[in-house]
């Protein structure tokens, strides 16, 4: 069986890339051809996720500093994706949070899309992106978004089966595309993120990619107002340029930038709690933290409502404000969550083994129905 696998792009070893790796593990490496708009994986991630397999790319691969500026190429991404020739395959699987489902293929080839989210800048987060764009209030920006919405809906009609990464995204797929979908939660490395008998230390942790929507800067500002509480921040990304200034003069806040997986896991295992303030559609890192038996303080939004048991594995706070973060910290101080076994138990329902079985069963059933 010839399989094509399509990803928006490969530039960081994040949640979407971990899903890609778990799907690719299901199929014979030699039977799968991988497509992406560009591939700038570091060598370690290339071996972990792609097992060293090459990726067919677009001209964006040759744009200098593409990892930092790729979002500015959104207007041409649909056109570039359509230039991939995905003919002659028995099965096409895409994992998309942007344009990966927009390729052209034989209509008689089964097309399955694992959707992380409909394209955020033109749907649920349109107002946020427009407010931050210098032309966000212009007629041209509005016209461009309308064009992308029409293209996005049209490309969704070429998908035979949608898989949603959460109930939250299932609802958004229905709202944006008018399509039904099946929920299969992403795979979480619950074996790698293990419970540890090490003594918990008196610090809070904020970890992840440093991009604006993660709101890590807001968490830092919250702890600037709590000088008696220690915060450790781990992560890199194009949004980190202001972090040095934010933590200056705050001895209770430490920003470590990049750390290896081994170091990061140790920090998670020893933390009092980990804080997640982003609007996440699922949030794999939040589940990885719970797999270590560490409680989380997370925004009451999206995937966190499905992955956090409020009052058992963490506390949900209502709004993206510094005060809400501070209130959540105070609540944990007054009502500690120390049943680390129960916290880990909650994470085990999102294991990689569970994902591979659910995904394989879904594809097999879809192929039987489609090719009967």
Language-model segments: residues:
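Acidic donor-binding loop of glycosyltransferase active sites
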Residues: 269-281, 294
């Amino acid at each position: 069986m010839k399989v094509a696998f399509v990803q928006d792009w490969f530039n960081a070893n994040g949640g979407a890339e971990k899903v890609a790796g778990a799907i690719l593990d299901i199929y014979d490496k030699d039977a799968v051809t991988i497509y992406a708009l560009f591939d700038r994986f570091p060598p370690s991630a290339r071996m972990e996720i792609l097992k060293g397999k090459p990726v067919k790319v677009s001209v964006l691969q040759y744009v200098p500093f593409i990892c930092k500026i790729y979002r500015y190429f959104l207007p041409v991404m649909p056109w570039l994706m359509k230039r991939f020739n995905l003919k002659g395959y028995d099965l096409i699987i895409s994992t998309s949070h942007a344009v990966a489902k927009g390729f052209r293929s034989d209509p008689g080839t089964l097309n399955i899309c694992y959707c992380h989210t409909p394209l955020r800048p033109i749907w649920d987060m349109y107002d946020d992106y427009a407010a931050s764009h210098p032309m966000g209030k212009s007629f041209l920006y509005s016209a461009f978004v309308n064009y992308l919405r029409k293209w996005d809906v049209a490309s969704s009609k070429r998908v035979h089966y949608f898989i949603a990464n959460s109930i939250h995204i299932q609802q958004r797929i229905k709202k944006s595309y008018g399509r039904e979908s099946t929920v299969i939660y992403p795979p979480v490395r619950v074996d790698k993120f293990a419970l540890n008998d090490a003594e918990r230390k008196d610090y809070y942790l904020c970890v992840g990619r440093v991009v604006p929507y993660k709101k890590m800067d807001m968490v830092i500002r919250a702890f600037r107002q709590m000088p008696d509480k220690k915060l450790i921040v781990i992560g890199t990304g194009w949004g980190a340029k202001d972090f040095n200034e934010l933590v200056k003069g705050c001895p209770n806040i430490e920003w470590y930038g990049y750390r290896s997986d081994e170091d990061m896991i140790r920090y998670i295992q020893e933390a009092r709690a980990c804080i997640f303030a982003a609007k996440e559609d699922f949030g794999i890192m939040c589940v990885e933290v719970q797999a270590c038996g560490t409680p989380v303080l997370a925004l009451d939004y999206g995937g966190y409502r499905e992955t956090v048991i409020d009052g058992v594995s963490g506390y949900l706070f209502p709004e993206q404000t510094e005060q809400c973060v501070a209130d959540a910290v105070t609540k944990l101080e007054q009502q500690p969550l120390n049943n680390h076994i129960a916290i880990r138990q909650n994470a085990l329902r999102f294991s990689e083994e569970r994902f591979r079985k659910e995904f394989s069963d879904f594809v097999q059933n879809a192929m039987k129905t489609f090719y009967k």
